[in-house]
Regions:
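Catalytic pocket-lining loop regions of alpha/beta-barrel enzymes
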Residues: 154-289, 300, 318
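Active-site gating/metal-coordination segments in enzymes
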Residues: 2-11, 75-186, 192, 208, ...
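Histidine-centered catalytic micro-motifs
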Residues: 22-33, 204-207
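Short, well-ordered coil/turn segments that N-cap beta-strands
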Residues: 19-22, 56-60, 100-107, 131-136, ...
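Alpha-helical scaffold segments that flank or form the walls of functional sites
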Residues: 38-103
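Mid-to-C-terminal alpha-helical segments outside catalytic/metal-binding sites
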Residues: 1-22, 36-60, 277-278, 282-289, ...
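Short amphipathic alpha-helices and their capping/turn segments at secondary-structure boundaries
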Residues: 9-19, 44-55, 119-134, 188-198, ...
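Conserved, mostly hydrophobic/aromatic
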Residues: 27, 61, 87, 108, ...
Length: 338
């Protein structure tokens, strides 16, 4: 297939299931990486609108940092303020109602370096100043892996670092949340970290960082039990909530992006269900939220297909539980007015 191509996605068309069900999408990005060879180099308000208005009732969304539109000069620790300024403008345009009723980036999650310890406070204050009404926290990548072919974006044992924990406490003192990415074999470390900073609301991204390609290919008999045990451990920490998504990224090992025609929502639901239902069983719906992770996940399926799949696999839950999964957990955690 043409990797990351709207024409390919259009080969699988379906009517939207339950089009009136309210949804808050708690995880997407905005970027313009025109100089980088990646799928969907440009994903701004027009591109997001094409997805969120493709059939489902997306009431609001949450922008998650992606190191885009940083300031070109000034102190390194403050360059990420540029991303917040950029997204604040897109959010204001969306809130005008000109494009439709969805409030894009109703909450904004930026980037700040907790390894600064207590010195992170002025950075967080600058981020908040750039978006007084929408900035709700930061995301800090903590993924580390010993294999050189696996992308590592943090030092080993960063979650145990005393400065990192001091920085997290500053975050808590300011009433801000912490989105975190890790790999599946780091989940026990995350549980230990969460217990050390019980006042911090931690949002674990992408079902806890499963990895099933490269050095972890053909090792499901080891990887999946390790992941399940890790999910169980982090679920025991009351200050951690979980995002259900990100599974369309190729590193999750499903290879849907290689199909001659995109997967249907029924088949996608069947393949997602064992992982997602396990997560919900451990965390409960009140601590879980369905996410799109667009555009990274867009290499595997369309927005309409993904949320159709989420609706199919969640039919076993009560109306209240489904409201939590699709909308209420996200708006509560990210403090979005409804």
């Amino acid at each position: 297939m043409p990797y990351g191509d709207n024409d390919w996605l259009a080969l699988t068309q379906e009517p939207t299931i339950e089009p009136d069900l309210p949804i808050c999408d708690p995880h997407h990005h905005f970027w313009d990486f025109r100089d980088v060879r990646i799928p969907y180099q440009r994903y701004l308000l027009d591109e997001l609108n094409a997805d969120v208005y493709s059939g489902h009732n997306i009431r609001s969304t949450v922008f998650i940092e992606t190191r885009s539109m940083y300031k070109p000069d000034g102190p390194d620790d403050l360059k990420s303020v540029g991303e917040i300024e950029f997204v604040q403008g897109l959010a204001a345009a969306s809130a005008s109602g000109v494009y439709g009723p969805t409030r894009a980036a109703a909450a904004i999650i930026g980037n700040g370096n907790l390894n600064l310890g207590e010195k992170v406070q002025p950075v967080l204050e600058s981020l908040k100043l750039a978006s007084p009404n929408r900035f709700q926290g930061i995301r800090q990548p903590c993924g580390w892996d010993p294999n050189p072919e696996v992308e590592t974006r943090a030092p080993e044992q960063q979650l145990a670092n005393s400065n990192f924990r001091k920085g997290a406490q500053i975050l808590a003192n300011m009433g801000l949340s912490l989105d975190i990415t890790v790999y599946f074999h780091q989940l026990e470390e995350l549980a230990d970290f969460a217990k050390s900073v019980p006042d911090v609301t931690i949002i674990l991204n992408h079902i806890g960082g499963l990895y099933r390609i490269g050095p972890y290919a053909n090792r499901d008999n080891e990887v999946l039990p390790h992941w399940r045990e890790g999910i169980k451990k982090v679920s025991e920490c009351d200050n951690i909530v979980l995002k259900l998504g990100g599974i369309g990224q190729p590193r999750y090992g499903f290879l849907w992006h290689t199909y001659s025609k995109p997967i249907s929502s029924e088949n996608l639901s069947n393949e997602l269900a064992p992982l997602i239902n396990y997560c919900i069983d451990q965390f409960t719906p009140a601590r879980c939220m369905f996410e799109s992770n667009f555009p990274p996940d867009k290499v595997s399926y369309s927005y309409n297909i993904l949320f159709n799949a989420f609706k199919i696999l969640s039919k076993q839950y009560s109306d209240k539980e489904r409201s939590d999964l699709f909308h209420d957990t996200a708006t509560r955690i990210y403090k979005i007015a409804t």
